[in-house]
């Protein structure tokens, strides 16, 4: 079993796809749930409100922690969401 490397509150990014997210929690079944998940391919936020969009811990290898510039970019996208 793969142990989670990210923790709640971490900003993560898949640099090849452009996906960015803020982790809300890691479940006992090793799924990440998100406060926000921005899909870079379609430039849209995924529906995380009903917890139907999650990520298995096994896929964390495709993600890295965001640097400060990337965090600011995601915060700006969240701020302007729906405008």
What are these language model-derived features?
Residues 3-15:
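Short coil-to-beta transition motif at edge beta-strands of beta-rich domains
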Residues 38-83:
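Intrinsically disordered, low-complexity, charged/polar segments
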Residues 18, 22-46:
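Basic/aromatic-rich interaction segments and small domains that mediate binding to polyanionic partners
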